[in-house]
């Protein structure tokens, strides 16, 4: 989708590249350096024309109790299906005509739903009829309701009671997605007598075991914690299992739960069990998992025609070509100019997220951070706080890239490039959600990474090239370097972030695109505030060459 034209008076500097822009994008004279580091950053921010937000503002915000937040923030967004979907012959898009039970219909009405999305309309009828389903759908398509509604109806029709134990298990890759699914399940089961629960890593295991012993009819779980309870919780009754849902199967396998899933499938009873497996992509590993979990002859449902683009219609997508040493300067400028927007910034490693969030908060640009090394309570609080915010910035790893329904996100910034087109699609899927959703995305690429665009084109992802004119980018490099040099804690955090960035870069699967040998380590170091890159020993490639040796070679080449 082509980017909208912008006037000079608009505050967002993002626009489509033109030859005239490129010719005129020379640096303007920088203001005289200011003595104190904090004052330096404040003046640059002032030159950008945006007031600095109170750094304590977010800490002072009153937070709701967990129960209230679960009810409010996990509620699915209501949107009508398009006419093209509703007019498809032979497909029922009406919840009223789907023959749901009275308690379920009452909950659906209270949640505000009237028409099904395409994936719901295609998937719910065969699931209600007891078929096993292997489903593929674009992110944000309403898949959660597509498997939850038949699961709730199954519990109702069998008149399952808490003493019968767990009859439905839903497995999902991340804790945040599990929390979201659990919240929706609770709303759907509001007028049912059956019980629902959740078990996730990082939560109180003893508390979970107590609830399981009392009887949880519908259980939402992450793989590792579920396997733990299956093996070690004596009061966990699961012999009456009637339905198994595996959501985001490709992601579950990508993050290393292949062995756990095989063990779970082996432990769970499979007699008369209905299985629903959803995956955005059909990899060999997903096919293997489907083979051992689904009954013979499952129904395959794909609601994404190959000719369609892989991302949402309301999403404007672009990329910017930027040398490594200018990456943070560009990010800082962009965030300051869009301080009133709701933005997610994706990075490739936990320590990089930690450093940049600490840095941005220190220079009075308030951000939240979310990554896999945080304690579960911190992750949950951060997730709900950002969901509830009308504006704000979330710096995160790909832990937030899949399935999460975060309301009204304006921008997705891929500061570190995604591993492959699937990761790109799931990252940008956090905005422009629902039928009428709108949003924008911007991906940072260095000149050596432009080959990734070929892969996106092959995956039917339309992108425009954008440019930030150089005179619109705040040159805070000297202030950044001074800050990292004088602040011990930030210096250590920057060093950890730098090392983690290189480790993540060397682990990319697209080796022809992300070639760590082509990285200019001096420029990479500058984006972390170092004049001279710190010494790190990371072995790269089959040759066993280390990052430190590569840095010495680059220094020799410059002499």
From Swiss-Prot:
InterPro entries: DDX18/Has1_DEADc, DEAD/DEAH_box_helicase_dom, Helicase_ATP-bd, Helicase_C-like, P-loop_NTPase, RNA-helicase_DEAD-box_CS, RNA_helicase_DEAD_Q_motif, SPB4-like_CTE. Residues 9-22, 55-75 have a biased composition (Basic and acidic residues). ATP binds at residues 137-144. One of its GO terms (cellular component) is preribosome, large subunit precursor. Gene3D superfamilies: P-loop containing nucleotide triphosphate hydrolases. A motif (DEAD box) lies at residues 247-250. A motif (Q motif) lies at residues 93-121. Residues 1-90 are annotated as: Disordered. PROSITE patterns: DEAD_ATP_HELICASE, HELICASE_ATP_BIND_1, HELICASE_CTER, Q_MOTIF. It is found in: Nucleus, Nucleolus. Belongs to the DEAD box helicase family. DDX18/HAS1 subfamily. PANTHER family: RNA HELICASE (PTHR24031). The Q motif is unique to and characteristic of the DEAD box family of RNA helicases and controls ATP binding and hydrolysis. This is ATP-dependent RNA helicase HAS1. It comes from Lodderomyces elongisporus (strain ATCC 11503 / CBS 2605 / JCM 1781 / NBRC 1676 / NRRL YB-4239) (Yeast).
């Amino acid at each position: 989708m082509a980017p909208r034209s912008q006037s000079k008076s608009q505050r967002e500097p993002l626009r489509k590249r033109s030859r005239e822009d490129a010719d005129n994008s020379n640096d303007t004279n920088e203001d005289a350096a200011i003595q104190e580091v904090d004052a330096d950053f404040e003046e640059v921010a002032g030159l950008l024309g945006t007031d600095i937000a109170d750094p304590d503002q977010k800490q002072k915000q009153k937070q709701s109790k967990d129960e209230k937040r679960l009810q409010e923030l996990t509620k699915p967004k209501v949107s009508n299906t398009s006419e093209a979907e509703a007019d498809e012959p032979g497909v029922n898009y009406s919840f009223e005509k789907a023959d749901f039970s009275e308690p379920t219909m009452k909950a659906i009405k209270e949640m505000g739903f009237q028409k099904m999305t395409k994936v719901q309309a295609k998937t719910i009828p065969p699931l209600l009829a007891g078929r096993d389903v292997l489903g593929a759908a674009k992110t944000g398509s309403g898949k959660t309701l597509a498997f939850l509604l038949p699961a709730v109806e199954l519990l109702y029709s069998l008149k399952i009671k808490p003493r019968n134990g767990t009859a439905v298990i839903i497995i999902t890759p991340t804790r945040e997605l599990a929390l979201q699914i659990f919240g929706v399940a609770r709303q759907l089961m509001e007028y049912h007598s059956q019980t629902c629960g959740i078990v996730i890593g990082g939560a109180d295991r003893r508390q979970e075991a107590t609830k399981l012993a009392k009887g949880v009819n519908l259980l939402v779980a992450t793989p590792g914690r579920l396997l733990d309870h299956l093996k070690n919780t004596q009061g966990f009754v699961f012999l009456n299992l009637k339905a198994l849902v595996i959501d985001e199967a490709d992601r579950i396998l990508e993050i290393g739960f292949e062995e756990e899933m095989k063990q779970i499938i082996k432990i769970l009873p499979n007699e008369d069990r209905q299985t629903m497996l959803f995956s955005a992509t059909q990899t060999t590993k997903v096919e293997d998992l489907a083979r051992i979990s689904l009954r013979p002859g499952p129904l395959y449902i794909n609601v994404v025609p190959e000719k369609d683009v892989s991302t949402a219609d309301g999403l404007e997508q672009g990329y910017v070509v930027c040398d490594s040493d200018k990456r943070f300067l560009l990010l800082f400028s962009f965030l300051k100019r869009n301080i009133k927007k709701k933005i997610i910034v994706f990075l490739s490693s936990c320590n990089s997220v930690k450093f940049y969030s600490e840095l941005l908060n220190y220079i009075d640009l308030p951000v939240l951070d979310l990554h896999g090394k945080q304690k579960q309570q911190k992750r949950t609080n951060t997730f709900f706080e950002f969901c509830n915010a009308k504006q704000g910035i979330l710096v995160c790893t790909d832990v937030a890239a899949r399935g999460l329904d975060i309301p009204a996100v304006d921008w997705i910034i891929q500061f570190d490039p995604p591993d492959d087109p699937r990761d790109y699609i799931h990252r940008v899927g956090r905005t422009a959600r629902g039928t009428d959703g709108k949003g924008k995305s911007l991906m940072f690429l260095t000149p050596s990474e432009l080959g990734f665009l070929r892969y996106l084109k092959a995956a039917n992802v339309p992108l425009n090239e954008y440019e930030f004119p150089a005179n619109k980018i705040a040159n805070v490099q000297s202030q950044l370097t001074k800050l990292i040099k004088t602040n011990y804690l930030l210096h250590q955090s920057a060093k950890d972030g730098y090392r983690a960035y290189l480790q993540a870069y060397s682990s990319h699967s697209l080796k022809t695109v992300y070639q760590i040998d082509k990285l200019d380590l001096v420029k990479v170091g500058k984006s972390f505030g170092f004049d001279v890159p710190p010494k790190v020993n990371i072995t790269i490639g089959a040759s066993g060459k280390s990052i430190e040796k590569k840095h010495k070679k680059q220094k020799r080449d410059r002499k």
